[in-house]
């Protein structure tokens, strides 16, 4: 008995611990009861908000739209503020890391490299003084020319030999040029020589000699110019480069022969030779082409007195051959002659598209050769204003079509006619 009671007494403590457990379990479900109170409060607040919302005299869709717009505006403002703050932080960080390098660059742009800071900035960016100077110094190589000079004391003649040119730049689409050389003595530009055109080459060999009749006593005040051009059949010829020789620096005790680098030519204005006005009329049924030389103006002064004695030659040409030739009367001592002289040529209709009319204004000289002031041609393979004039004539048969034309240098027109055969 004693042992049984003793066992019951020992079992009592565990019983008390088991009985204590339920209260701890009872406290846990109490929290949901507290959450339910919060939900009731939220539902009451929601109900109150909806009641107030219902009092507003607007349909539900309008309220929803207003709410969406308001939310979008708030989000946009927040995004802009965040972006602005981040941008400021980045700029400050860059300024600290680079030590104001950008500020120096701006100053470099404004001051164009006048201070030591600009030089330091160049060093930072990897540019050196040599590299800076190389940009404007990118001088294009223009090639070189070989020539010879001699003087014939018995005949008072300067002998200029154009031997060859080399390493010329390519000015044509095919990677070549069509070079030729103009030779003249300054200050007198009236007498000019030129070599033959050499096709599609950058190393032309000319081997041509030209003679200038100049007394030795006057030679020292003159300058020889050798200008290399690229021939262009459709437009003005491009100058490649030139070389000038002052005659007072040449020793004419022996023949001079040397290579010299071509230099960039000064852009000289096209010498104004004057303008000429003439009319064209074609009658297809009769095969008759009529050219009326009306007048010329602002002609180049050719005589010592500052005037000229101009007259006009008209050539009918086909395939480089002169078929017919006409000329006007000579007008004395004038740079603005008036002619109004008519000339007719027989040209069958099937040939009218193949012929050319070449108009040349010349200065009459009693002694010596008559010098050409300038010329122009219309018809087959003409371009620009000359082509328009010819086209207008063909488009208006039996009607005279008058037009002004600018005179061009004789050598340029002759070169174009030589190609356009």
Swiss-Prot record:
User: Which residues participate in Ca(2+) 2 binding?
Assistant: 171-172, 230, 232, 238
Q: Where is the composition biased (Low complexity)?
A: 10-23
Q: Which GO terms describe its cellular component?
A: axon; chromaffin granule membrane; cytoplasm; dense core granule; plasma membrane; synaptic vesicle; synaptic vesicle membrane
Domain of life of the organism encoding this protein: Eukaryota
**Where is this protein primarily located?**
membrane
SUPFAM superfamilies, per the entry = C2 domain (Calcium/lipid-binding domain, CaLB)
Q: Which residue ranges run through the membrane?
A: 61-81
Q: In what way does this protein cross or attach to the membrane?
A: Single-pass membrane protein
CDD domains for this protein:
C2A_Synaptotagmin-1-5-6-9-10 (cd08385), C2B_Synaptotagmin-1 (cd08402), Syt1_N (cd21963)
The entry annotates sugar attachment on 25
Q: Which residues form the C2 domain?
A: 141-260, 272-405
Please name the Gene3D superfamilies in this protein's record. Answer: C2 domain
Tell me its cofactors.
Ca(2+)
- According to its UniProt record, which protein family does this protein belong to? Belongs to the synaptotagmin family.
The Swiss-Prot or TrEMBL note on domains reads: The first C2 domain mediates Ca(2+)-dependent phospholipid binding. The second C2 domain mediates interaction with SV2A and probably with STN2.
**Protein's recorded name:** Synaptotagmin-1
Task: Record the organism.
Answer: Anser cygnoides
Gene name in the database record: SYT1
């Amino acid at each position: 008995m004693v042992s049984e009671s003793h066992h019951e007494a020992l079992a009592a403590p565990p019983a008390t611990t088991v009985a204590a457990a339920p209260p701890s379990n009872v406290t846990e479900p109490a929290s949901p009861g507290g959450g339910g109170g919060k939900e009731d409060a939220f539902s009451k607040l929601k109900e109150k908000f909806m009641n107030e919302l219902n009092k507003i005299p607007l349909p539900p869709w309008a309220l929803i739209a207003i709410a969406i717009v308001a939310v979008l505006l708030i989000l946009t403002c927040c995004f802009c503020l965040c972006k602005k703050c981040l941008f400021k932080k980045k700029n400050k960080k860059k300024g600290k890391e680079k030590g104001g390098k950008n500020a120096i660059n701006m100053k470099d742009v404004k001051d164009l490299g006048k201070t030591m800071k600009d030089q330091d900035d160049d060093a930072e960016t990897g540019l050196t003084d040599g590299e800076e100077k190389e940009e404007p110094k990118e001088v294009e190589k223009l090639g070189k020319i070989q020539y010879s000079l001699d003087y014939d004391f018995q005949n008072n003649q300067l002998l200029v030999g154009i031997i060859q040119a080399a390493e010329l730049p390519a000015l044509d689409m095919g990677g070549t040029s069509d070079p030729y050389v103009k030779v003249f003595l300054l200050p007198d530009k009236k007498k000019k020589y030129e070599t033959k055109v050499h096709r599609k080459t950058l190393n032309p060999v000319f081997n041509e000699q030209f003679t200038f009749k100049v007394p030795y006593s006057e030679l020292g005040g003159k300058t020889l110019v050798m200008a290399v051009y690229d021939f262009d059949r459709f437009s003005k010829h491009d100058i490649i480069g030139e070389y000038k020789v002052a005659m007072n620096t040449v020793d004419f005790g022996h023949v001079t022969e040397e290579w010299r680098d071509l230099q960039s030519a000064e852009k000289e204005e096209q010498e104004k030779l004057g303008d000429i006005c003439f009319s064209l009329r074609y009658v297809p049924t009769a095969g008759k082409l009529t050219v009326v030389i009306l007048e010329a103006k602002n002609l180049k002064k050719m005589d010592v007195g500052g005037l000229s004695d101009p007259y006009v030659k008209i050539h009918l040409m086909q395939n480089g051959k002169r078929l017919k030739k006409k000329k006007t009367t000579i007008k004395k001592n004038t740079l603005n002659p008036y002619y109004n002289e008519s000339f007719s040529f027989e040209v069958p209709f099937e040939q009218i598209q193949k012929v050319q009319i070449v108009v040349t204004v010349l200065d009459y000289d009693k002694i010596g050769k008559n010098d050409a002031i300038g010329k122009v041609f219309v018809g087959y393979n003409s371009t620009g204003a000359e082509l328009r004039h010819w086209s207008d004539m063909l488009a208006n048969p039996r009607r005279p079509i008058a037009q002004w034309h600018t005179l061009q240098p004789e050598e340029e027109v002759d070169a174009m006619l030589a190609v356009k055969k």
